[in-house]
Amino acid sequence: MKKNSLKKILATTLTLALGAVALTGCGSASAKEGAAEQTSEASAAEEQSDSKVYRTLDEIKESGEINIGVFSDKNPFGYVDENGEYQGYDVYFANKLGEDLGVKINFVSTEAASRVEYLETGKVDIVLANFTVTEERAEKVDFALPYMNVALGVVSPEGKVIKDLSEIKADEQVIVISGTTAETYLEKNYPDIKLQKFDTYATAKTSFENGTGVAWANDNTEVIAYAIENKGYEVGIPSLGSQDTIAPAVSKGNSTLLEWINSEIESLGKENFFHADYEATLIDTYGKDYEETLVVEGGKVSDGAAAEASSESSEEASTSATSEAAEAATEASSAK
């Protein structure tokens, strides 16, 4: 009887002990899981924080400085004068942004191919470098409202003016700057034309003047300015492709800065600010004739520019439809 009682007591004690061990194990596992979960959440938060390369509007204001990417060699849009000061149409606008924001401006010299990269890495807060709005670029950066109209153009020597791209021979080259809409447009629509690409405006200009290419394709505002300032050259193709716009750009997702810039552009439009900008920086190059064509006030593209773009789109659609109809007719004739 005593032996049986002792066995029962030992069995009960052992069961309780094993239960306590099991509970301790569960508690330990639960604690480990909780700690792991907290670590994971902290890592995710840290990763998310690290992925934000841009500075918000408030952060810029708190720092007292803003970094704006501009060209340093593209007169009259962005260039450094003989006194080492930044000047030009884009710079005039940038100075106004800094003034109204109440911060110091740090100008950062950029090339066409670096504009997206500088925003993606947070090297600059805004790009104001003759930046044409395109769907491809809009996937990587956020564009604000436009402040200028633009199309593509082609300049060539007066002795051999290129008035149509079909005049370019198979062994001849067209000069473009890497990262520009001219490069993208020609590669997509004229893949047979050989392109000589350069990273900077200065090297492209020098190469063109040395006869490396039979023509230079760029924004029409730039090639027109080039032909006016350099004797012996003519813009044989003043408008190529569709009518586009120039706009400021910020890092993808920087909504606070983007909204402020849009509001600023709308407010400046009420003052005809961009006409004043044109007359201060561009009129010596283009004269009064181009002012209404190029300037966009308050982020609103004029009806004339919109109509021109619409007309070009309609013409392209009509040409495409005619071509398709002719092709269908040929196939039908062959079938007979």
Task: Name each model feature, range by range.
Residues 131-139, 187-188, 202, 209-210, ...:
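A ligand-binding cleft/hinge motif common to bilobed small-molecule-binding domains
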Residues 27, 45-46, 91-100, 178-180, ...:
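Extended ligand-binding regions for polar small-molecule ligands
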Residues 149-156, 224-265, 284-304:
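Periplasmic-binding protein-like
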Residues 106-118, 178, 196-210:
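Short helix-initiation/N-cap motifs at beta->coil->alpha
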Residues 49-51, 181-198, 235-239, 265-310:
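Ligand-binding clefts/hinges and TM-proximal coupling segments of bilobed small-molecule sensing domains
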Residues 22-37:
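Bacterial lipoprotein signal-peptidase II cleavage site
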Residues 95, 99, 104-168, 240:
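Acidic, polar ligand-binding/catalytic clefts
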Residues 34, 39, 46-130:
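Extracytoplasmic small-molecule ligand-binding "clamshell" domains
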